[in-house]
Curated annotation (Swiss-Prot):
Gene that this polypeptide is encoded by: cvfC
One Pfam family, short name: Virulence_fact
Presence of the UniProt keyword Transferase in the record: no
InterPro entries, per the entry: ARM-like, ARM-type_fold, Nfu/NifU_N, Nfu/NifU_N_sf, PBS_lyase_HEAT, Virulence_F_dom
Signal peptide start and end residues: none
Organism expressing this protein natively: Staphylococcus aureus (strain MRSA252)
Protein name: Conserved virulence factor C
The family this protein is said to belong to: Belongs to the CvfC family.
Role noted for this protein: Required for hemolysin production.
UniProt GO MF annotations: oxidoreductase activity
Amino acid sequence: MEILRIEPTPSPNTMKVVLSYTREDKLSNTYKKVEENQPRFINQLLSIDGITSIFHVMNFLAVDKAPKADWEDILPDIKAAFSGESQVLESGKDPQIDNHFGEIKAELLTFKGIPYQIKLTSADQELREQLPQTYVDHMTQAQTKHDNIVFMRKWLDLGNRYGNIEEVMDGVLEEVLATYPESQLPVLVKHALEENHATNNYHFYRHVSLDEYHATDNWKTRLRMLNHFPKPTFEDIPLLDLALSDEKVPVRRQAIVLLGMIESKEILPYLYKGLRDKSPAVRRTAGDCISDLGYPEALPEMVLLLDDPQKIVRWRAAMFIFDEGNAEQLPALKAHINDNAFEVKLQIEMAISRIENGDEALGSVWKQMTNRTI
């Protein structure tokens, strides 16, 4: 058994260690102290100074450390527990950092288009929250005696969020209640009871003009417009540019998401506005969009993000430079080699190593998949 990769998680005190071995019993265990009946490698890890607990399931471990402990001291000992060496894994490869550091996936559970529960999933945690009771009541009203709610319910992908998972839940709840106001629930029930509800995209995709958007005073209505917006085109840029100046973070974030759908270098200046937003969630979302587009022209702007106060943003910048960078970015990378966030430091080291070794910049995983299909 050996380590395949080590991935950071949204918690600064937890690392995910992916193993070459998968448990056959499909069970999970949490270990907090050394005991004779535990696997030997678990006891070895628990003996490492600074490790407080280990969660083992399937093919990975979630290793927790004490808040004052340093990952830079702990990780060599974790490697040694599997390889017998302090610096090199048995596979001869350095651990690879995850492509989704800091992401929290947000999903909305719906039945016939009526929402009633939110789920957030991070690398090591899941959090659910039911919408107010009136949403559950209206969802129940939409059922008929022939409906099977288990088979008919659907999870809608709300995209990724960043930050403390409890705070993210508060923000997503606010967004959902704005997108699906209580006043619309009776209409949604009426629509759900119609036979063609499954194929009718009622009230979901509706294009709005710049004038209509500009005349809307309520931020919840503006957010609802953007959430129900069809795939944008160049003609929609003025509207989305206006939304980038909105006082509400969810509106600005959704504007960035929509701008990222316009797959052109001409959209980069607008995404750069997102990189300078006062909200780290908007800055990270803009960085993700730029990473997905994979235009090397964005390198100068992403290099500036290595000085961002938020590590989730600095990490995205370092990851983009790893994906797209060249020797021109080496001075900036080396100037930030001692980043105080271990995950960022590790990604910077990987970028430096890739460039100095002369390895080709392959681009993001998404870009590689796209190129492979051409």
